[in-house]
Amino acid sequence: MLLKCLLSTAVALATPSVAYPRSGVGKLSTQTSERPSIAADPAWRTASRLHRGVNIVGYDPLWDDAQKARFKPRHFRIIKQGGFDFVRVVLQSFKHMDAEYRLDPKWLATLDGVVKDATAAGLSVILDEHDFNLCSEAPDACEPKLIAFWEQVGARYRDAPDTVLFELLNEPHAPLDGPRWNSMLSRLIPVVRATNLGRTLVIGPTRWNNLDELPGLELPKSDRNILVTFHSYEPFRFTHQGAPWASEAAGLKDVPFTSADEARIKADYDKVGAWSRANDRPVLMGEFGAYEKSGTPIEARARYTATVRREAEAHGFPWAYWQFDSDFILYDIDKDRWVEPIRKALVPTRR
């Protein structure tokens, strides 16, 4: 493993950066003796300009063959015009690494295009490393790959504007439990900070970014440029009914979304808000949605979606819907149109 880490460091040192103006991300103070204002606190400032987002391109053929891409550059403009201001780019990078954990130059060029096109459309961008199952199943094998990824991506985007955020890993879960995740973060965060001292990082707790695990998340007290994320799929029996990968919900059908469910969502977000205030950390709700291939009436899914969106906004959480295309669909790429009941639940009036 030591040899692998040394090799990955050498790769990172040789990784070219993408040309951006130097006015992007500067060095920021880590003094925290007093609670800074939003204008001075980088993470809170980032959170204040993020409002409504959508997850994109995680399972798009784009990453293997740009000619087969479903998602096109014009979709960034459609997202912006639809009332959204940021995208969470879902990256499964490990399969695009060689034996020394070097990222495929073609894959990196595709990523460059995604970041460039999203930024040109006026969208903020979260780069989300999404190999969470591989990392959770084998944390020791994952760590050098994850370090190599952020060494290379960090060096490449060191001069990107501050509208580009780095999410270190999506949804860690057992056996990558709280103590192991905190330990990994203690090594991973310095890797990113070596090239991106002023970059906003997105980091969430274990158990699939479960809000109940927030108290156990250990972050460097001196690093105030971290946006803490959680994911919100409760009531799971409703949102994942009929989903074949969700064992406890795969066989369910006709599960309603109830007023009791609405009350639980509010209570859950009250807990997140209390944690945010107590720890002086801004919070992002990075995923929520309801599976659309289950036969669940779209009216029920839209009501769930509107409830979550409304409560998130009432609590001051920017949010990202899961997802633009595929099985929690927001935009029908084949028919080139929004799924309007879901879009209206997310953006009741155009921004």
Go through each PLM region and give its residues.
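N-terminal export leaders
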Residues: 1-6
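An active-site-proximal structural segment forming one wall of the substrate-binding cleft
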Residues: 76-85, 103-129, 136-165, 184-195, ...
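Active-site region of glycoside hydrolase catalytic domains
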Residues: 40, 147-262, 266-290, 307, ...
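Acidic/histidine-rich helix-loop elements
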Residues: 55-73, 93-104, 237-262
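Hydrophobic h-region of N-terminal signal peptides that target proteins for export
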Residues: 9-17
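Aromatic-rich peripheral "rim/lid" segments of glycoside hydrolase catalytic domains that contact
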Residues: 295-351
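Surface-exposed, active-site-proximal loop segments in enzymatic domains
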Residues: 62-66, 93-109, 130-145, 296, ...
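N-terminal carbohydrate-binding accessory modules
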Residues: 20-86, 101-102, 275, 345
